[in-house]
Regions:
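Short cysteine/histidine-rich zinc-coordinating motifs and their immediately flanking basic loops
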Residues: 208-213, 227-228
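Short alpha-helix plus adjacent loop in nuclease-associated cores
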Residues: 126-143
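Short metal-binding segments enriched for Cys and/or His
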Residues: 220-228
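Residues immediately within or flanking Cys/His clusters that coordinate Zn2+
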Residues: 146, 193, 213, 219
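Acidic, divalent-metal-coordinating active-site segment for phosphoryl/phosphodiester hydrolysis
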Residues: 161-174
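Short cysteine-rich clusters marking metal-coordination/redox-active sites
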Residues: 196-199, 216
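Conserved non-catalytic scaffold segment of RNase H-like nuclease domains
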Residues: 1-111, 115-116, 120, 138-143, ...
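Short, flexible, mixed-charge glycine/proline-rich loop motifs
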Residues: 179-193, 206-209
Length: 228
């Protein structure tokens, strides 16, 4: 069975499922999924959540538990991957998938598991917010999910548990979407995104008391403005 995938989209979409996995390690060939979570979004509003632990049928290494906090005792009575994946694929349907670093990590685990356990391929189109963040916020020294959350003043408590990461990722994606839409409306085709000369963040065009102006997207940490 082919592991063929959908297209990667560097854009904002209004309807999507943001998802995240926790695993026993970094290799989709030799490591296992131990948690799957997803949040279904319609027109920017969360309408449904999915989350489950997964029994990997092998001990979870301490190196994984140290990162995500998931222990062997927690997954002892959890569903096996075959059943968890079947439920998750039903949840996502043919929605566009959104996640952070999913192009290189999560989707490889998902495709490998679906092929091995269910004989299915996952062909949903997807948006990787890591790629999108590098386009929208090139000035950031790092583009981890927690880096984006801190940049946008979004709570990072509970990071590295799948559902918490989904919540954080969804909020960050909506912020990135605002940057993209603003840039699309206020720059000519092929023109670079306008950036703040003080901190390097993208400038957003806003309407103020005295008319339109450009303001830094990192407000209130940076209060740079200029006339539009």
């Amino acid at each position: 069975m082919s592991k063929a995938s959908g297209k990667r989209l560097n854009q904002y979409v209004k309807d999507y499922v943001v998802f995240d996995l926790e695993t026993t390690g970094l290799s989709p060939e030799t490591d296992e999924i131990i948690e799957i979570s997803g949040i279904k979004v319609r027109k920017g509003t969360v309408i449904e959540e999915f989350t489950t632990l997964v029994n990997p049928s092998r001990p979870i290494p301490y190196s994984a538990t140290r990162i995500n906090g998931i222990t062997n005792e927690m997954v002892e009575n959890a569903p096996l991957l075959k059943h968890a994946l079947n439920d998750f694929l039903t949840f996502i349907g043919d929605d566009i998938l959104v996640g952070h670093n999913i192009h290189n990590f999560d989707l490889n685990f998902l495709r490998n598991g679906a092929c091995r356990e269910l004989g299915q391929s996952i062909q949903n189109d997807y948006v990787d917010t890591l790629s999108l963040a590098k386009i929208c916020l090139p000035q950031l020294p790092r583009h981890r999910l927690t880096d984006l959350a801190e940049h946008f003043h979004i709570e990072t408590k509970g990071a590295h548990r799948a559902l918490n990461d989904c919540v954080m990722n969804q909020l960050c994606y909506e912020k990135l979407g605002l940057l993209l839409e603003n840039a699309k409306e206020n720059t000519a085709p092929g023109q670079a995104l306008p950036t703040c000369p003080k901190c390097g963040n993208v400038l957003l065009k806003r309407n103020g008391k005295f008319g339109a102006f450009w303001g830094c997207s990192s407000f209130p940490s940076c209060r740079y403005t200029k006339n539009a």
